[in-house]
């Protein structure tokens, strides 16, 4: 009984153990739980081990995949950061400023870092070299190269590399400094500083900053590591901003660009350019770079200024409009024609005889001045402004004029001689007509203008200067400076087409005059400008070039012109008569505002743009509309007598 009970109990326990442990579970409905006993138990164990091994393999694969994924994420992050993250690379500051040696001084002038190549030989001075260091430090003092001083700070300083002297022209004379000296002459007074004013390195002059400031409306400060001077010489409105938080100024606009310097919260910067996400700025200590726009605030306009008294150059302008006529006098005997040439004139205020010229390249002048001529003109109620030329005398080339003017002693010699001759003849003024000025001679010519102006005014002589119509190629005549130191600036609004032109054309079209006046008035006040007009024109003769001629000219400017031209200058009456003699008829040309005629003869074509009362009136209207100081005519004896009444209607 007990055995059966025990057996029954065992079976019963076996069923209980074989069940899943929840309602509805049976062998038929699910896999039974194995206990490890019997054949079926051993088979279940193997299956469990197999499952465990599979699970481990899956876990390993999953782990490896996670590791690979993490590596990929890290790699992608590194690539992303490399491409888009901020760089901590610092710029080489000495390279940024162009510093090569321990005594070099970097210059930041009006928010611009001046590089070595920017201060090299591209200027008009013959003392320039190809490798000018912008600034230097000598014996603890800071110096600026002359080329940089002239081009970027104060163009009135003048360096004579031949005679080793630095000049600065004041209204009453020159300030003069010799090299390696702490002494200088201000007009006639000797002064000194506690530093050497002028140092030289070959032909390169370096001028001490405090001495420059004495004659210049500028402020400067100096920073170290590296040595640099921050100079401001332009005043007026600027844009500033405040730094929101500590950040970097970078070389270019972008987070990968090298860092120039750090700026602190509340630092003030000058804003130069707005490039959306970045601002180009200048820091107070002289770095010009870029800051993220979001790090700036309180952006605003400010006016900056400095108390400084600019030198005032005295002027001897007349209290009436100028009606001046040049008188082309070629020898002493020609002075006797003054009565004849003035006989038919009316309304003239000034006569300008061509009396003085350069005799040689040593600073001597030739003169055919005549006191009797002056007395007659004065009796007729006119002033005499004697013309001083660099041609039709002993010299007649660009090189000869350059060779004369680039020496201070030669300039002083010719200035003294021409003023003395003018005073001796009793003239009222000097009219400077130097037309052979090359670009390299420009700075020397302008210095002549300054110096001669001072000496004229010291001798009660009106000083006027003749100029071509302003063009880019003659900008070295420096109309702006002329307008400051001279009494009158004369624009010769003729020779639009000359004897050497490759094609026929007007000597003085209306647009040529208008353009000349417009460009001049950008640099010189109207009450100092005199417009020169012609009493002559050119009769042109043109023939078609042969194939042989075109072949010979191949590769030259002349080759682009199909006709060969020649011309001769004619006075107003002679020009009009040439049209009549040819049986031609002149017609009004609206474009040039001149009467134009052409005719065929002598195997070619003649063309002429006439100067007559009609064309002159068109020019006089332009002069009047622009409220200029007056008019000048080239030249006496070539006009129609009727023009004087016309001119008087427009020039009172």
Q: What is the predicted function of each stretch?
A:
Residues 351, 432, 489, 531, ...:
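Conserved, mostly hydrophobic/aromatic
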Residues 329-345, 408-423, 471-479, 611-624:
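Short, acidic/polar
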Residues 355, 413-444, 491-503, 632:
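Active-site groove signature of glycoside hydrolases
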Residues 55-275, 304-317:
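Primary recognition of N-terminal secretory signal peptides and signal-anchoring hydrophobic helices
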Residues 1-53:
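N-terminal targeting leaders characterized by basic, low-complexity, disordered sequences
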Residues 306, 393-395, 400, 537-619, ...:
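Glycan-binding loop/region signatures in secreted carbohydrate-active enzymes
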């Amino acid at each position: 009984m007990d055995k059966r009970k025990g057996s029954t109990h065992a079976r019963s326990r076996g069923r209980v153990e074989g069940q899943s442990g929840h309602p509805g579970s049976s062998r038929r409905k699910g896999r039974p739980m194995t206990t490890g006993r019997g054949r079926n138990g051993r088979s279940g164990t193997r299956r469990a081990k197999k499952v465990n091994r599979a699970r481990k393999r899956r876990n390993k694969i999953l782990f490896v995949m996670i590791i690979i994924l993490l590596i990929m994420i890290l790699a992608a992050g590194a690539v992303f950061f490399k491409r888009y993250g901020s760089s901590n690379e610092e710029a080489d500051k000495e390279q940024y400023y162009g510093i090569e040696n321990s005594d070099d001084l970097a210059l930041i002038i009006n928010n611009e870092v001046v590089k070595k190549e920017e201060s090299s030989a591209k200027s008009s001075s013959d003392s320039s070299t190809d490798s000018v260091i912008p600034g230097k430090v000598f014996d603890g003092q800071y110096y600026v190269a002359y080329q940089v001083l002239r081009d970027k700070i104060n163009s009135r300083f003048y360096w004579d590399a031949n005679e080793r002297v630095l000049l600065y022209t004041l209204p009453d004379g020159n300030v003069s400094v010799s090299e390696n000296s702490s002494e200088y002459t201000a007009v006639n007074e000797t002064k000194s500083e506690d530093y050497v004013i002028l140092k030289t390195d070959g032909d390169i002059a370096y001028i001490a900053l405090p001495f420059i400031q004495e004659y210049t409306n500028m402020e400067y400060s100096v920073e170290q590591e590296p040595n640099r001077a921050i100079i401001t010489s332009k005043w007026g409105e600027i844009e500033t901003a405040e730094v929101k938080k500590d950040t970097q100024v970078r070389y270019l606009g972008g987070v990968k660009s090298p860092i120039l310097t750090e700026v602190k919260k509340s630092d003030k910067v000058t804003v130069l350019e707005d490039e959306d996400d970045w601002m180009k700025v200048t820091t107070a200590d002289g770095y010009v770079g870029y800051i993220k726009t979001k790090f700036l605030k309180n952006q605003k306009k400010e006016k900056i200024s400095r108390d400084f008294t600019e030198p005032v150059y005295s002027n001897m302008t007349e209290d009436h409009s100028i009606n001046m006529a040049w008188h082309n006098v070629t020898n002493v005997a020609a002075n006797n024609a003054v009565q004849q040439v003035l006989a038919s004139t009316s309304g003239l205020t000034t006569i300008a005889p061509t009396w003085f010229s350069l005799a040689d390249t040593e600073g001597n002048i030739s003169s055919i001045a005549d006191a009797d001529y002056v007395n007659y003109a004065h009796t007729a109620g006119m002033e005499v402004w004697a013309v001083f030329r660099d041609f039709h005398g002993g010299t007649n080339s660009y090189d000869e004029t350059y060779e004369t003017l680039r020496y201070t002693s030669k300039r002083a010699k010719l200035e003294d001689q021409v003023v003395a001759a003018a005073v001796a003849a009793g003239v009222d003024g000097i009219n400077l007509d130097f037309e052979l000025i090359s670009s390299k001679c420009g700075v020397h010519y302008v210095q002549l203008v300054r110096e001669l102006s001072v000496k004229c005014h010291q001798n009660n002589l009106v000083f006027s200067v003749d100029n071509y119509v302003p063009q880019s190629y003659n900008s070295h005549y420096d109309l702006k400076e002329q307008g400051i130191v001279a009494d009158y600036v004369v624009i010769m609004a003729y020779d639009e087409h000359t004897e050497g032109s490759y094609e026929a054309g007007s000597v003085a079209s209306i647009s040529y005059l208008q353009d000349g006046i417009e460009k001049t008035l950008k640099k010189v006040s109207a009450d100092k400008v005199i417009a020169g007009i012609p009493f002559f024109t050119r009769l042109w003769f043109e023939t078609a070039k042969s194939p042989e001629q075109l072949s010979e000219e191949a590769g030259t400017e002349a080759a682009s012109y199909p006709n060969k031209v020649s011309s001769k200058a004619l006075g107003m009456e002679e020009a009009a008569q040439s049209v009549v003699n040819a049986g031609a008829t002149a017609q009004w040309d609206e474009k040039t505002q001149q009467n134009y005629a052409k005719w065929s003869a002598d195997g070619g074509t003649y063309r002429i743009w006439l100067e007559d009362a009609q064309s002159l009136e068109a020019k006089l209207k332009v002069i009047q509309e622009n409220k200029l100081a007056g008019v000048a005519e080239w030249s006496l004896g070539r006009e129609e007598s009727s023009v004087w009444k016309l001119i008087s209607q427009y020039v009172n």
